[in-house]
């Protein structure tokens, strides 16, 4: 067993040869945060009495869902063969929506621990992050976690991992994050296998931002990895992508609580506080340099995160609109990938059109708005960005079905995605059938082992963002895992389907869909609304239309009042007169009457799953 470091290296005065920067790559639920907890305990940076499960996941949603959303960086001392080392563990998100954050975290490291559940084997998203790590030429340490589980099959999955990375099955370490078995051997392996950082200590300072977090009291806390030179407190620094300059008010390392230091030298990982109040000022992937002696070239690899999925968010109570605006402004401080603009809908009132990285991002933002700011929201069906070329060659970018141009259209381009699906061999047929139905093109298939297959498809992004994942899980009994990334676009035969209530268009229900699926969408939506809209005193037609052509129709039957109840016997002409009068009244009502769509109908009709219908039922 390696003892705890007796005199740990001091930040800003640490020789790069004793620094080890590494991250943990793992799928959701494979035990990454639990293993991180054991490392914090083994290295003694967290006292046993302060320990709590998932120590590094600070957000409530992170702890409840058991996922990591924001990256964290922790400095831990560890001693091997009498030499004291400083280990910097950078905790990365495991979900596909946060791939850009993962790639920046990987760029800050020299090595990665590939953590795989010994009872489940490798998943699609872990594979995607593993390929990212290999692109960054990181030293990979394969590790099987949860070996204490009764269902664990370490020998089988060790062989699978070994064939993937190209090592021997004996080289795959076996640990248990729960009991702590093998954690110390893993820390020793980190020191021995991962190289120390390379960098020029005398060059002008260059540091890469791999995360920034908004703190209510101190403004934005920026996490950086220093590549060249050094950063000291009270000096002026410059962000290379925006050219803005700031004074460093505080500089330090997380261990795992923030500890101010006298600076950060080449190869070290720590945090900076400049008093900035907005995360957009310190962008993930940007390069920080000294203002007086700036570096000539940035570190490269920086890109603005692009929203892939758009959805309208509207408060159920219209008076909550200012609260929603403030709430989005606050979330934006901590989430540079969030974009939004105000939008009005005839049916739903005032709200925002919000851009997200993916469906999980959408769900998390919505949940945080509802939970942290106590808002009740309706979100419209998610859609992607289309490029529409009209006949006069004008190109229109459409993020909302209501922006889809009328009249003659030359072509519509839709974004595509490369999807990787890992699935047990017996479900290949079901998965291929689903992807074919979603207009996907098969790109390739590889057997990872005798039982598990990796299938690659090129598939329209619009098909993935709606309910693809739910259907994939139900067809494979929950065994499939999916990873996707945006990959070009293609020309497609897309049309806008409008829903008309008594001849009037309801903008919230419009959808852009493939011509082959338009009829199915129309029938589904008209059928749903027929059940949800209350009956009127007159017949109400619900129609689905493409342009001026009606493709589906349902009628809501009229409620009929019995006007003859007061006639006991008597002449037939008296009864006829009353019936004619009722008929006239209904005709007049139909001309002037407006159908109000109740709020519950919107919630139920716009939810792709049963959740909205349940919510409506509660009301």
Swiss-Prot record:
CDD domains referenced in this protein's UniProt entry, alphabetically: EF4_II, EF4_III, LepA, lepA_C
Protein EC: 3.6.5.n1
Location, primary (coarse class): membrane
Gene Ontology terms: cellular component: plasma membrane
Keyword Cell inner membrane (UniProt): no
Domain tr-type G: 17-198
Membrane topology classification: Peripheral membrane protein
Biological process annotations from GO: positive regulation of translation
Keyword annotations: Cell membrane, GTP-binding, Hydrolase, Membrane, Nucleotide-binding, Protein biosynthesis
Residues binding GTP, per UniProt: 29-34, 145-148
Localization per record: Cell membrane
GO molecular function, one term: GTP binding
Primary enzyme class: hydrolase
Catalysed conversion reaction: GTP + H2O = GDP + phosphate + H(+)
Claim: Protein biosynthesis is one of the keywords in the record: yes
Family matches, as HAMAP family: LepA
Chain's role: Required for accurate and efficient protein synthesis under certain stress conditions. May act as a fidelity factor of the translation reaction, by catalyzing a one-codon backward translocation of tRNAs on improperly translocated ribosomes. Back-translocation proceeds from a post-translocation (POST) complex to a pre-translocation (PRE) complex, thus giving elongation factor G a second chance to translocate the tRNAs correctly. Binds to ribosomes in a GTP-dependent manner.
Family listed: Belongs to the TRAFAC class translation factor GTPase superfamily. Classic translation factor GTPase family. LepA subfamily.
Name of the protein this chain belongs to: Elongation factor 4
Lineage, broadest ranks: Bacteria, Bacillati, Actinomycetota, Actinomycetes, Micrococcales
Gene: lepA
